Curated annotation (Swiss-Prot):
InterPro entries: Aim3. Residues 64-77 have a biased composition (Acidic residues). It comes from the Eukaryota. The lineage of its organism: Eukaryota, Fungi, Dikarya, Ascomycota, Saccharomycotina. It comes from Vanderwaltozyma polyspora (strain ATCC 22028 / DSM 70294 / BCRC 21397 / CBS 2163 / NBRC 10782 / NRRL Y-8283 / UCD 57-17) (Kluyveromyces polysporus). It is found in: Membrane raft. Keywords: Membrane. Its main location: membrane. This is Altered inheritance of mitochondria protein 3.
Amino acid sequence: MSDFWDKNKGSIASGFKSAGKYTYQGAKYVGKSGYNASKNHYNKSKEQRDKRDKKKGKKKNGDDEYSGDDSYSDDDSSYSTASIPVSSMKDPNSFPPPPLKPQQVQATSSSHSVEQYPASAGVPQQQLRQLPPQPISATQQPAWPQQPAANQYDGQVSAPDQSQMQYGGQTQYQQPPAMQQPPAMQQHPAMQQPPDMQQPPDMQQPPAMQQPPAMQQPPAMQQPPAMQQPPAMQQPPAMQQPPAMQQPPNMVGQPSNQFQLPEPQQRQTPPLPPVTSQPYGEAQNQAQNQGQFQATPLSQLQNMQQEETTRSVPNAYDPQQTYSQPPSIPQRHTPQPVVNQVQYQESQSSIPQVNQDYYGQQPEVNQQNNLMNRSIPPPMQQQPPMQQQPPMQQQPPMQQQPPMQQQPPMPPRGPSLAAPAYGGTPNINANAQLPASSGITVKPYNPDEVQTREPLALKVDIGNLPPPPTHRDRGTETRPPSEPKPSPAIRNPISAVPAVSRASTLDSSSVPVNSIPAHQNQPIYMQDNSSSVESFPDEETSDFNNLPPPPPPNRRVTEQNLEKSAKSSTIGQEQRNDSKTEPPRAAIVGSFNSNPTINFEPPPKPFRPVVNSDRKSESPVQPQPLARSANGPPALPSRRGTQTSFESHPTPPSMESSTPSLPNRLNRNEPPIAEKPVSSFPPPPKPFRRVEAESPSHSQVNDSNKESSAPRTHNFGNDEDEDISAPVKWNPPAELLERKSEIDVKKGKKAPPPVVKPKPKNLSSVNKVNPEYEGHKPVGSMNQNQNQNQNQNSLNSITDELTHVHLRKTGISLEDEGKKFGGNDTSIDDIPPKFEKIETSRKPKAPPAVPKKKDSIRGAPPPVPAKKKNLNATPQPPPSRRNNNVNNDNDDDDSNPFEKYMRDAVPAEENRLRK
């Protein structure tokens, strides 16, 4: 081992060098790679942030800035975590809804859904999808004169136009039941315009009114000359349908197209309020009332357009905008009556005039772009409308304008109907009337604007209202002394009784009027607010306030006591009014005042039933109040919360005592027994016990009691002659003692035990047994000092000791043993133990002694732990449970833990395997 380092230190050093070299190179490579990667990532993300900042700088207008997150992505075009401002987003109303499968229901947020019907066979579902229209700026305007080339694309008719003639928020072209086309004639979803430019059901135009005369309608379906459009509204020759696109002769009376269109439910839009889902009758009635509205002036529409284009934040969703078609109605081949055609043509002819003047012209390129984006299938051709109107989807700012609110009414047969504001036309009821003024502008709702609320002025003077009603037991009413109380005549039920009967009622029931609460169910009498509470006369109020308080509850009341209590209560009331320490308060019936003012003597004690009430009522002298004893019980609580004096209580009649040993009970100047404190009474007699020292003869007891045989009289009324607080000693008379002794003899009570002879001095040592005898310690053993003290005790203590010691009779008397060994001079050791304890004889013998282990085998005993405090209170087992034969050296040690347990249960060593 000593040569290991000398032999291998070169290889060990080279290994350390190579390991350190490659470790350094690897760490350097990893560090450089990470640094370059992070640097490249930072540069790329910085370029992306710069590009975004440039784009946002171009898009920002005025205050439309947003504080986006500058976090960057890992690559160039994977994703961007920065949020896009809402102002730069496209209007969601311009997007078409996603296509739905047949029998699929579109989930709506307006608590109703539109059921979808299967599409017509022959048109694939993929061909029904439509791209969203290309948004253009607000400065671009649709072109009214449109070339035929704009209506055709690859030999097929474009979709101008029947749907674009409609305005408002209606997405689907839903025909009324009587005017709907069969599935072969229905409009393709690609020809439908976005939801912000279509017409609600009440403004829809049936296809029968949109067909030119070249479509071979019957004469009844043709438009009469009086209902045709004005020259400015009619379609130019270039907009007419070519002959090849007209309806074949076999379709006379039922206009149709050369292709089959799916049902309008194939293209579902956002929800529409239920009010727009109207049957055909309502739509027809609304169409008849369309003539009541006239067109808005051109200058006003231009001003509204400028206001709407300057607004950067779009309005919130208008629930009145019709974004979806009404619930679909089964398509029927039903010809249209002539009356309906005339009515719809009348409402139709007034629409395009404002649109032409307001929107101006639009280049043909925009129309072609829209037609190309709609992706109409090649075999499809469109039903040409009779009138072509400009597409209204190119004006998104007009969507914010409140619809149908700027058109004043006009005569029913007016030539033009007002074109409502672009986007979100509400459903017009048949009886709807628009405001007459045409200069109304709607201010958009700004949630951040601070709204000032007008203060509401109370029309009722609160100061003149009476106080509200309160519960009668809620509390006492406190009023200043100067303010008069309201008369109880309007508050108390007693007020309905006349004054004479009311006074008699008070005397009989002893219930004062002022004890009834001041506020008691005020809504019953609160009828006139003009009359105040203070307008009642003061004479009646003073009469009620001067009534005496109620007396204490007496179960047996006489008329004399009532008169006396009323007189004394009136005196106490006058004394309280003179003091004026606090304002008077009305008492509450059935309540107890927890904080009374205690400035009067305690009430009298309860009394027994009246035996002779006339004798005490004639006493002219009032008894003096007794001084309360320190040992007596506390006074009873007051039964009333009002202030009373001791004189206000009537003196209860006393019961004449039938005891002949108390002659002073007949004295009328002395208060009755019920009014005296309990502590003044003598204690009850103690149970009789004979004195054992005087038990041989009762003559001494009888002689000593002759002097006290005379009855003792007590003057309870005189406080100077007797100390009431001192306990009164009472000795029973001799007759009572003799009578009780005779009763005890008759009952068979044992005679007293005979006089016990004096105990010998060494009697207690007889029971002392040698500790080695029977292998146990006697319980009654005592030391020598205890024996000496025991000899000095009295005879009673010796008797008590003998009663607790159970001795077994051995046939040897104690006197014989004393005479045998010479009386009291016998020593303790000379007397053999003739007596043993009974309990000892019944116990089994102790187990044999275990031999002591050798010190060499026996290990050192473990250290004895300190004695715990909680073990001191543990009672020790009886001496018989201890094993005293094994090593009794440590028995007297207080800290020895084996005193509390059996030594056999505790091993003496930790390891038992060494035995």
